[in-house]
């Protein structure tokens, strides 16, 4: 694919946490070949035997998980969802965006399938640790409220404006199309939460993995259908 490039693999200088040889890379259901996966603090990279590969920046990774559902994919693997398009899909998405008024965020699904499935836990842990080093700037900004303070005393004297508050129903009407789509997606993810474990499109977080913001274990119980189905995962 055209997005595959030649570059030196990340080393200790980039904080290499995990190097997993004999790992097959799959993008949106299409195999890219077998190579080595490099999980470094700076980026997530994969290179095939010829030295061609790709790198993923952590801020673009919206979800990573260990998938053990053999109904969704025939082999256990590390699943990574990225907010971007790659290869031919990136060209198609540009054309679609020109014809569409909706601001739809691009999504790509990667599956990294190691020949040694026992390495999945170490791969998952390394991903969680590296992802934590790259917090979402939007989350940080939300902690610092820069808006004007509401002066109760001024309001009582008729000198201040009443801040606008919305009920749940009213708030929905003020959401943008993108906001509504995001809300619907999140509600769908949370609708199957059960006691201490939460099922989100086949992804389950348990107490042992709650410390990881973006990482989660996949539910292996047969009661959840459609876990990590291609092109409709989410997160």
Swiss-Prot record:
Broad class of the protein's primary localization: cytoplasm
List of residues that carry Phosphoserine: 100, 142, 191, 193, 196, 208
Gene Ontology BP term (one): spliceosomal snRNP assembly
Keywords attached to this entry: Acetylation, Cytoplasm, Cytoskeleton, mRNA processing, mRNA splicing, Nucleus, Phosphoprotein
Modified residues (N-acetylserine): 2
Record field: compositional bias (Basic and acidic residues): 204-213
Residues with PTM Phosphothreonine: 221
Location in the cell: Cytoplasm, Cytosol; Nucleus; Cytoplasm, Cytoskeleton
Compositionally skewed regions (Acidic residues) per UniProt: 137-151
Keyword Zinc-finger attached: no
Region (Disordered): 1-21, 133-157, 195-217
GO MF assignments: intracellularly calcium-gated chloride channel activity; lipid binding; potassium channel activity; small molecule binding; splicing factor binding
Consequence the record notes for mutating residue 49 to A: Removes cAMP sensitivity
Family: Belongs to the pICln (TC 1.A.47) family.
Subunit structure comment from the entry: Component of the methylosome, a 20S complex containing at least PRMT5/SKB1, WDR77/MEP50 and CLNS1A/pICln. May mediate SNRPD1 and SNRPD3 methylation. Forms a 6S pICln-Sm complex composed of CLNS1A/pICln, SNRPD1, SNRPD2, SNRPE, SNRPF and SNRPG; ring-like structure where CLNS1A/pICln mimics additional Sm proteins and which is unable to assemble into the core snRNP. Interacts with LSM10 and LSM11.
Descriptive protein name: Methylosome subunit pICln
Native source species: Canis lupus familiaris
Source species taxonomy: Eukaryota, Metazoa, Chordata, Craniata, Vertebrata
Gene: CLNS1A
């Amino acid at each position: 694919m055209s997005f595959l490039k030649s570059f030196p693999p990340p080393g200790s200088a980039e904080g290499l946490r995990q190097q997993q040889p004999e790992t097959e890379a799959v993008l949106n259901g299409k195999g890219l070949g077998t190579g080595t996966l490099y999980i470094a603090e700076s980026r997530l990279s994969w290179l095939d035997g010829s030295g061609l590969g790709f790198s993923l920046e952590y801020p673009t990774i919206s979800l990573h998980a260990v998938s053990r559902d053999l109904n969704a994919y025939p082999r256990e693997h590390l699943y990574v969802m990225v907010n971007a398009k790659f290869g031919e899909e990136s060209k198609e998405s540009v054309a679609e965006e020109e014809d569409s008024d909706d601001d739809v965020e691009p999504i790509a699904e990667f599956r990294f399938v190691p020949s040694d499935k026992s390495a999945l836990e170490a791969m998952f842990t390394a991903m969680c640790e590296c992802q934590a080093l790259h917090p979402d700037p939007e989350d940080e900004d939300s902690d610092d409220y820069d808006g004007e303070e509401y002066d109760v005393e001024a309001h009582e004297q008729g000198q201040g404006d009443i801040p606008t508050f919305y009920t749940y129903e009213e708030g929905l009407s003020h959401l943008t199309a993108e906001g509504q789509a995001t809300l619907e997606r999140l509600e769908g993810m949370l609708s199957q939460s059960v006691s201490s474990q939460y099922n989100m499109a086949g992804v389950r977080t348990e107490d042992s993995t709650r410390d990881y913001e973006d990482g989660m274990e996949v539910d292996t119980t047969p009661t959840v259908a459609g876990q990590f189905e291609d092109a409709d995962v989410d997160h």
